[in-house]
Amino acid sequence: DGTWTYFAGDIAYHSNKISRKFDMLINILGADHAGYTKRIVSATKAISENRVNLICKVSQLVKLFKNGEPFKMSKRKGDYITVEDLIKEVGKDSTRFMMLNRSNDVELDFDFKKVTEKSKDNPVFYVQYAYARINSIFRLLKLNLNAKIKFDNKKFTLNQYEIEILKKISEWPRCVEISSNKLEPHRIPFYLYDLATLFHSYWNLGKDNISYRFISDNKPTSTTKLIILKC
């Protein structure tokens, strides 16, 4: 009947990208558009003569919960929450972290209460709290977190928990590389949560055993721990 379709407009949109010399295109689609991917990928190959690679990432739905109950949205009734509303409620950092904290092919339950509570169950708080604890040590010692720390290699010793933390830290470059190559950003918050868990566990050991505390009268040991914290 002459009515424009989404497909026609999208072909023109992708053609414009190709004309701007992009050789890889990425589309992020909702789960309800999963069946659309083959058509647009085929169209992109045709108009680019197979020169351009179009990757379609299908994201599952985000379910919102308030006070433990599902928040049912309806455009017709005017009951809905925008991204702007979400950011105002919990903050942009929490919103970004939680949205990335699941693979795109897995549904996400976004609980307002959980995202704002101060507990291990809130990954945003748990990771930020690790950073806050590290900074508190440097403030207490009146040291600049970015300053170089002098140490004696011969006196540089590590216990099993410190070795475990350093092993995890050494995985960071590889984690970033895989996340980029596979287009899987959820690997980043997963990694940060695991690293924060190791740090908090080690911190808690110091409550009962002074040899595990980050600040002590043993200067070589304290220096070793400060270097780990800088990492």
What are these regions (language model features)?
Residues 1-231:
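Non-catalytic interaction-recognition regions
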